């Protein structure tokens, strides 16, 4: 919501997050950068079990992605329209305009519609104003053959698993199994 009292909300979220992190048996993070940020800034977490698990995809979503035809790409760059300042829609529009890229804004699509749009488009521009630990849209766009333009706020963008489609598939297929194995190990 663009009208949120962000400072008050952020402070409340930080306090809640710290309570959860301090009292948990395991802390799951969405990216290495996110984990490292917390370890650097919250020394009490260094002795905790901190694990990067990333985004999770259900079998239906993975099947839908695999079923998309990606051999007929147009020259359109996609930008997700959002009223949330952190998503950086204005940054993405400015970038596309300055680079004279053919772009299209999208919003309020079903997952299937969005995946189909990614499958037929050249690329996806996402330039958030703040940390976005592991945005699914970036992962889905890359799996569907889109070129990606993003900034350092997309925290997983430089991680090894995100460098190519094969390693992305391997990562998301293993995430669910890895997560439940970790939970089972800690229940003992």
Regions found by a protein language model. Name each.
Residues 2-27, 119:
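Membrane-proximal helix-turn-helix segments that form the acceptor-binding/catalytic region
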Residues 3-10, 102-105, 125-127:
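Short, flexible loop segments at the rims of nucleotide/cofactor-binding pockets, characterized by
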Residues 19, 95, 117, 140:
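Hydrophobic/aromatic ligand-binding patch that stacks against planar heteroaromatic rings
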Residues 23-26, 74, 120-122, 145:
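Short, well-ordered alpha-helix to beta-strand connector turns
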Residues 25-66:
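Donor nucleotide-sugar binding/catalytic pocket of nucleotide-sugar-dependent glycosyltransferases
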Residues 55-112:
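Conserved catalytic-core segment of nucleotide-activated headgroup transferases in glycan assembly
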Residues 111-121, 143:
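Short acidic alpha-helix that forms the nucleotide-activated donor recognition element
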Residues 127-188:
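Catalytic binding pocket for nucleotide-activated donors in carbohydrate/polymer assembly enzymes
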């Amino acid at each position: 919501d663009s009208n949120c009292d962000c400072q008050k909300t952020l402070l409340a979220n930080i306090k809640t997050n710290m309570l959860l992190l301090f009292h948990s048996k395991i802390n799951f993070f969405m990216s290495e950068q996110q984990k490292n940020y917390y370890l650097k800034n919250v020394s009490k977490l260094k002795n905790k079990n901190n694990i990067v698990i990333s985004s999770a995809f259900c079998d239906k979503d993975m099947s839908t992605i695999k079923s998309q035809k990606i051999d007929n790409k147009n020259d359109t760059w996609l930008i997700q329209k959002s009223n949330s300042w952190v998503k950086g829609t204005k940054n993405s529009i400015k970038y596309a305009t300055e680079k004279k890229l053919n772009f299209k804004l999208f919003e309020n699509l079903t997952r299937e519609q969005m995946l189909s749009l990614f499958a037929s488009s050249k690329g996806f521009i996402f330039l958030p104003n703040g940390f976005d630990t592991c945005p699914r849209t970036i992962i889905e766009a890359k799996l569907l053959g889109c070129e990606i333009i993003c900034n350092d706020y997309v925290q997983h963008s430089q991680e090894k698993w995100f460098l190519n489609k094969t390693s992305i598939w391997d990562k998301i297929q293993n995430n669910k199994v890895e997560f439940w194995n970790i939970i089972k190990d800690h229940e003992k």
